[in-house]
Amino acid sequence: MEKNYIYTSNHGYELDVTIGKFAEQANGECYIKSGDTSLLVTAVASEKPREGIDFFPLICDFQEKLYAVGKIPGGFLKREGKASDEATLISRQMDRPLRPLFPENYYNDVQVIATVLSMDEDHLPDCLSTIGASIALGTSDIPFDGPVAAVSIGYVDGDFVVFPNEEQRKKSELDLTVAGSKDAINMVEAGANELNEAQMLEAMLLAHEEIGHISDFIQDIINEVGKEKNLVEVVVASELEEKITSDFAEDIKSSIRTTDKMERGEAIFNIEEAAKEKYLEDYPESEDEIHRVIDDIMKKEVRRMISIDKIRPDGRDLKEIRPLSAEAGLLPRVHGSGLFKRGQTQVLSVTTLGSPADVQIIDGLNREEIQKRYMHQYNFPPFSVGDVKPLRAPGRREIGHGHLAERALVPVLPDASDFPYTIRVVSEVLSSNGSSSQASICGSTLSLMDAGVPIKKPVAGIAMGLIKEEDSISILTDIQGLEDHLGDMDFKVAGTRDGITALQMDMKISGITREVLEESLANAKEARMQILDLIEATIEKPREDISDYAPRLFTIDIDPEKVRDVIGSGGKTINKIIDETGVTIETEDDGHITVASTDGASGKKAIEMIRAIVTDPQVGDVYTGKVTRIMNFGAFIEIAIGKEGLLHISQIDHARTDKVEDVLAVGDEVTVKVTEIDKQGRINLSRKALLEKPEREDKEDYKNNSKAEAWPADEDPRNK
């Protein structure tokens, strides 16, 4: 039965939710609208749990349908294909707040699909997809401890804005998305233009206040039309669990204190193998349980060490950063490189500079194509964690980490008008023991500065963690992999000395107070300053010049009406410039032209050729042109593409010239001066006006060259 619900916010937006209209065979569904943006969100679970796994198999998919904005997909097939990076990021944004709210021992496959059916630019579908997923799951029979909601916050002209529209987003200093329940924030994603910690905290709390109102709205829907939830089998401590704990707990606790990740992993592996050898005969098919029990013992001990002993597995105190090292300029032929190491996490970042023609063009749910001039790509090869796996295309995690690092650095990049290069940074994770995304931010700062990119300020990132045991809360600075896996929070903060540029948080528990968030941000700032000290000690400021192997860019702004003159009929003119100089040329409708060359001389020559095309010659101007034709009375010189002037025989030299061919040949370059432009626009040139006049030994030799000789108009080929 179809039901409709409407939520009207005090902040000026509306949610329109319909249940029971679409997708009747899904476990749960909702049709959600805001403005002209509408999505169908479905939730489906398998009937039985998947066997042999120790993780929850949740899949969240965000589908962009170009018909939603009245566009036909490009390409030969004319249909949507692989998910775009934007769709992947929104899929992750749905997954992160939903995943912690399923029962711990629930192993049924669950798929949530959010399909964009219609969209306007003022109402983005990202937060709507999370809200819709919460409604679909909450009203279904799938076990889910919701509701949750998501809210976006902007910062425009000194004020925070809830769900900013398109115009406000263009001016906003903040792009913040917060998701959570009425009682807790459990996901944050943000890019900011150096907002301080107090401003970020205020924005997060404003978002959470609105999340509470939306959660109440969702709960009302669930109370009215929600299905009875399926039961989840409760796992009780088994006899085997008690035996493993009794026989191996002390060995496990001892191995946890091994500071080296690989040695610790080997020690735990040996314990697990010993447990299997001891128990599998009496407890066949219990391999998964043995692994789970050992993991639980590790988790309890790590959390006890941190909460009670205030010491971490690698011996650090709670606020201590792992050993740091940094290096810039280590690769000789690339445009820029930086190596950053924090503990056993090591990232190599490499910068490549390209012309404006190298921008990434993105065609998605936008009225117009998006052109990205800065790209940050993150790679996580299997050897970085000692694994053997086939190499695949970048997954969701790689795309998400690359996006986070990209957001962190965008605010400090120079304007395109000051530095017109397209910039690509690739971060290669060479070794990972936690916080590799933040290490990629630090490595990228080093790499950009080494490449001569005039970034406004260096950027660094740090990952914070948290362990909450009853009333004891321990905030951790610079978490390693084990603390991330067994802890309650992963809070990544990146920024400059003056403020935050990117932030990402995933919280596994509720009950985190304002004071805890405040302290986490303060500790992150303190750590960030230490890392920035190292970066600035490694490379104090961006290199004065770009690499010898990077393209040289030259720009010129011309009258937009003359762009067609530079291009020429069928591209003839611009192709001639390219052929003669070996450059690449990018023209824009507003008259801005960019020339890219492998050396400065070619670029400067191309710019001069363009300037000559669009500039009307004036008497007194000097050009270096090419001889195109020779006549008995002089030579025609191309001073610019499509512009010729006559160099009369009397203007070739101070001495008498009997034959033009004695001095010039077709194809010769000659420097000439404009001496006259007649009423018909014909250009007369002189070479001798630029030559030093010698002392005359034979006055007759110079007599006939004292002035240009006239010729009948009908003999001038420029009139034919």
PLM features: residue spans?
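Extended amphipathic alpha-helical scaffolds
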Residues: 1-46, 54, 229, 233-369, ...
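Long, basic N-terminal domains or extensions that often function
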Residues: 1-232
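Glycine-rich, flexible beta-strand/loop modules in the N-terminal catalytic cores of phosphate-handling
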Residues: 26-111, 116-123, 189, 330, ...
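Conserved phosphate/anionic-ligand binding catalytic regions in large, soluble enzymes, centered on
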Residues: 28-30, 123-141, 328-351, 433-453, ...
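Flexible, glycine/charged-enriched surface loops at secondary-structure junctions
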Residues: 104-110, 145-147, 214-232, 262, ...
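Mobile "lid/hinge" segments at catalytic clefts and subdomain interfaces of large enzymes
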Residues: 142-258, 448-544
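Long, charged amphipathic helices and adjacent flexible linkers at domain junctions
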Residues: 228-238, 530-556, 604-624
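Single-stranded RNA-binding regions, centering on S1/OB-family and related RNA-binding modules
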Residues: 551-553, 560-720
